[in-house]
Amino acid sequence: MGTEFNGLFDEWAHTYDSFVQGEDIQYKEVFAHYEDILEDVVNKSFGHVLEFGVGTGNLTNKLLLAGRTVYGIEPSREMRMIAKEKLPKEFSITEGDFLSFEVPNSIDTIVSTYAFHHLTDDEKNVAIAKYSQLLNKGGKIVFADTIFADQDAYDKTVEAAKQRGFHQLANDLQTEYYTRIPVMQTIFENNGFHVTFTRLNHFVWVMEATKQ
């Protein structure tokens, strides 16, 4: 993942929270049960947490309230600025992304929501391999993102978006790197993790991977 998405993130920063509240009809189903999704990620995390894609700080805030020690990584300057307004003054957010980041001294859980699809499948594998080296046995990766059970599920979702006139959503699904569960299962298992997938809305699944 390079910097190709940073412009998009900067543009989206000031409207992101309205998206997650379901104000955009095309993305309403993508963000259905948003608060529950964040809570699920928090509940599956423990200890020192490395968060990729802090965004406007919604997950970060819940992690901090739950007593986690959080190290936040976010590539977008605009997102970092908005998040800092919402989070405790002493909390710092470091510039970086899934593949290029400052490594904290201690990591128990790596988390992210609505962001891992910015990496190609090859980049996802590189990232998970890197995280495997950083986590001790029992350490966890907890990612919530749009993924699909198989190719047929993906094809049907794209076609349904087009039929409903949701052309922005359809384009998004076809241009970013929304992967399939078998691909992610192979990536995690090949890098020493046991992984489970839990569906929380039509689009979003929570991937909980534990280092073996």
Curated annotation (Swiss-Prot):
<comment type="similarity">
    <text>Belongs to the methyltransferase superfamily. YrrT family.</text>
</comment>
<keyword id="KW-0489">Methyltransferase</keyword>
<feature type="binding site">
    <location>
        <position position="53"/>
    </location>
    <ligand>
        <name>S-adenosyl-L-methionine</name>
    </ligand>
</feature>
<feature type="binding site">
    <location>
        <position position="97"/>
    </location>
    <ligand>
        <name>S-adenosyl-L-methionine</name>
    </ligand>
</feature>
<comment type="function">
    <text>Could be a S-adenosyl-L-methionine-dependent methyltransferase.</text>
</comment>
<dbReference type="Pfam" id="PF13649">
    <property type="entry name" value="Methyltransf_25"/>
</dbReference>
<dbReference type="InterPro" id="IPR041698">
    <property type="entry name" value="Methyltransf_25"/>
</dbReference>
<protein>
    <recommendedName>
        <fullName>Uncharacterized methyltransferase BALH_3960</fullName>
        <ecNumber>2.1.1.-</ecNumber>
    </recommendedName>
</protein>
<dbReference type="GO" id="GO:0032259">
    <property type="term" value="P:methylation"/>
</dbReference>
<keyword id="KW-0808">Transferase</keyword>
<dbReference type="InterPro" id="IPR023553">
    <property type="entry name" value="Uncharacterised_MeTfrase_YrrT"/>
</dbReference>
<dbReference type="GO" id="GO:0008757">
    <property type="term" value="F:S-adenosylmethionine-dependent methyltransferase activity"/>
</dbReference>
<dbReference type="InterPro" id="IPR029063">
    <property type="entry name" value="SAM-dependent_MTases_sf"/>
</dbReference>
<keyword id="KW-0949">S-adenosyl-L-methionine</keyword>
<feature type="binding site">
    <location>
        <position position="74"/>
    </location>
    <ligand>
        <name>S-adenosyl-L-methionine</name>
    </ligand>
</feature>
